[in-house]
Amino acid sequence: MVRAIRPIFAGENVELRIRKEDMNNRKKILLLAIAFVAALSGGNGMRAQAAEWNPKANPEAVVRSGYARFTVLTPEMIRIQYSDRDQFEDRATFAIVNRQLPVPSFTTEERDGWLVVKTEALTLQYKIGGRIASDAAASADVLNISFNLNGRRVMWYPGKDDAMNLKGTTRTLDGQIGDNKRAELENGLLSRAGWSIIDESPRTKRGDGSTSFAFDGDVDGMPWVAEPVDKDAIDWYFLGYGHQYKKALGDFTKVAGRQPMPPLYVLGYWYSKYQRYTSDEFMEIVNDVKRNQIPMDVMIFDMDWHTEGWTGWTWDRTAIPDPEGLIDWMHGNGLKVALNLHPADGVDDDEDYFQELRSDMGLDSTVKRVPWNLSDGKFYHNMFNRIIRARERQGVDFWWIDWQQNLTSKYMDGLGETFWCNHVFYNDMRLNRKDHRPLIFHRWGGLGSHRYPIGFSGDSFTTYGTLAWQPYFTATASNVGFGYWGHDLGGHQQYDGNNPELYLRWMQYGVFTPIFRTHATNWEGIERRIWKYENFPLLLETVKLRYALMPYIYTACRQAYDTGVSLCRPLYYDWPEESNAYQFEDEYMFGDDILVAPVVTPTGDDGKAQRRNWLPEGRWFDVCRNTVVEGNRVFTDSYTQEETPYFFRAGAVIVNNPPMLNLNTRPDRLILKVVPGGNGSATLYEDEGDTQGYQQGVFTTTRLVHEGNTLTIEPRQGQFPGMLQQRAYTVEFLATDRPQAVSVNGKKLTNGAWGYNEQSRTVTVYVPATPCEQRIKVELL
C-alpha cells in the first residue's frame, strides 16, 4: 500500500502528531543546560555537553512512503530505511546512537510517481512503491540522491561503487610489513566523490565478519545488545558533504557519539614489553627511568602477570609476590598501571574466585571452566563483580584487551567480540569508577568504536617500510573518528638485531602520534629500554619533546571531542582541492598548527636521510631550519638523525611545558612559542585531567592572540578544582630581529627580564607569576 504524501515543509509532520508540550519542555531544559555551560566556559565556543544517547528521531524529520522511510538528520545526511515487514529500527545501533537533532529545513512532494525530498544540499528521489534492496543491480530507477560538487551535479544510487573513498581503518596491524594491510582498510566516511554510506543494515558484514546490532534496555545501567527488529531491513545513512570533510566528521559525531577525552596521563610515555618481569625487575626499570631523568606516566604489565602465560586472571606470585604492594609502589612513583588480558578462554577451575563465579552462574560443581560469554548479562555482572573488580581494588588503573580469538561470538550469531568487549569494558569503567575517565586499550571493532578510546594497533614488524606506512594509517583512521591509535613504537617483532637509527626514527614519529608507547615481543634480543642504546641522548630528546608539547596536544584532544576532527588528520581536511594533499600520504596535521613529515628511511653515506616534502599554500615555520618558508611547493631536503621535519603554521602560538618528569604535576610556568610569518591565535585548554567533569563544563580556556610583534594572553575563562590561581610565562618570539626594547602591559622591561639569542634569533621574555584572570600583553618595541 502506498500512502499519498502532500507537499510539506519542516515544522509539519507527515504521519505523527507532535507532542508540543513535551517538545517545549525539552527545549527549555536544553536552553538551561546550554546557558549553564556557557557561563562556565565563558562563551568561548568549547561547549561541554553530556554525551547524547537519544536514538529516536524527531517525528518532524521523518518522511514515510509505504515500506520506505527517510529521516532528514542534517541538510547533508539522510537516513534511508526499507522494511518489507513494515518494522523500522528506532533504537540505537552499534554505529548510530543519537538521531534527535534539530530538524533542518526541507520539503517533500509527489511528482510523476516519485517522492522528492529536498534539503538545501540534497535532492532525494524515491520511486513510490519501489523496493530498496542491497543485492539489486546498481540502478537509479528506484532511489537516487543528487547534489552539487564543485559546480557539477553528482548522483548517487544503490549499488554505486565508491571507488574514491578515502578509507578508514582496520581491526589490527598484526603481521604488518610495509603497507601489506592497505587492502584491509574499511571504507571511511569521506570520499573524493563527495558522498559515502554508513550501512547499519543487520545483514551487512563489518570488516571482521560481524554485523551491527541494536541496543535495548540495560544490564547494571549499561546499554545492552539486542536483535534487530527486522534482520532483512535496509538501514543506510547517506552522507553528501562533498569535500566539507570536517563538517562531515562533526555531524557524524552528533549521531554516533563524540570522541571522549582520554585521561591526561595516557598521552605521556608508556613503558611496555612482553616479558616475564619480576617485581624487582619492574622496579629496576622505574629506577633506571628516574636515574636517567626520563619522563614517564604508564607502566604496562603484559600477559606474564598471571600464572598461565597466554590467559588467566590469577597473579603469578613467584614473579610478583605482592601485587598490591608493587602497584602501590608504581603509584607512589607517579605511574599508572594497566594489565594485559586475553579473555576468550573464560575462567578455569585453578583461577582465583572460580568457585564463587561458578556458583554465581548457577553451574554444576563438576564444571571446570566458566566460558567467556560477554553477550550474557548475567555473566557480565558476575564476572566483573567477582574478578575484574577484585583486580581494580588492587590498584589496576585500566585494561589492555589484547585478543578475543573468536572474531564473532559463539553464543550470539554475528556479534563482534572485539566491538562488544570494548563496549562492555569501557562502559563498566564509566559506570563503576565515576571519579575517573573510562579507558581501555583495544583493537578496532568497527564503526562506533571511537566511543571507546584508545586503540592498540597490534603486532607489526620492525622495518622501515612498516614505519613508513604508519603515518598514513594513523591519520586515515580519523576518517571514521578513531583518533587514538597507539602503536608498538619500534615495532613488535624483528628478524635481526636492534637498529638504533630505526628505533630513533620511530620515536621521532611517535612524538606526533596519539599514544607514545614503546613495546616489543618477548624475544630477549629486542631492547626497548631507550637508555640501553648508544644514541640514548637523541632518544631522550624525543620523550622530552613529547612532554614539552603536551599542552598543545591536550588542547587538540579537547578540540577532537568538540568537533570530531582527530588529533592526527590527513592534509586534505584543510586542502581538499589540492592533489598533493592526497598524494603525500605520509604527511599529516598534528592538531591545527603543526604539519609533520617524519623521516621514514635510513640515512645515506653522508649521514643524512633525504625526504621529499609538500607544503600547502601559505607560510610555514620550518622548525629544523629555524626559518619561515613559503608554501604551495614541493621540495627535497636532507635530515641528520638529530632532525625530524615538522612545521608550525605561520603566526601560530605553540604552548609548551617546561622540562618535567610526569604529568601528575601542573606546571606553574608555561613556554609560549610565538611563530613568525603572520598573525594567529591559539587556545590553551585545561581541566582536572582524569575526571568526567570536562563533559559538564568543568574546565578552563585561555586565549592567546598574536598580532605583529605583540602577544596577548587573555584572561582565563571557566574553572575546575585544583586549577592554578597564577602562572608565569616564558614567551619566545622565534626567528626574529633583536628589538630595541620589550614591554609587558605597557611597561618597558629591564634587560634581565628579557634576552636575545643571536644564534637562534630568539627573543625570550620572562613574565613573572601573574593572576590567571589578568590580561597580559607582551610587545616587542
What are these regions (language model features)?
Residues 33-41:
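Bacterial N-terminal signal peptides
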Residues 42-50:
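Sec-dependent signal peptide cleavage junction
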Residues 70, 78-80, 117-124, 595-598, ...:
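Short, well-ordered beta-strand segments enriched in hydrophobic/aromatic residues
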Residues 73-112:
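A low-complexity, Ser/Thr/Gly/Pro-enriched, surface-exposed linker/loop concept
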Residues 105-108, 745-771:
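Extracellular/luminal ectodomains and secreted, surface-exposed scaffolds of diverse proteins
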Residues 109-263, 273, 279, 286-291, ...:
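Catalytic and substrate-binding clefts that recognize carbohydrates or anionic sugar/phosphate headgroups
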Residues 156, 295-539, 574-578, 584, ...:
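Aromatic- and carboxylate-enriched substrate-binding clefts and catalytic-loop regions
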Residues 426, 447-455, 470, 477-487, ...:
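Catalytic core of carbohydrate-active enzymes
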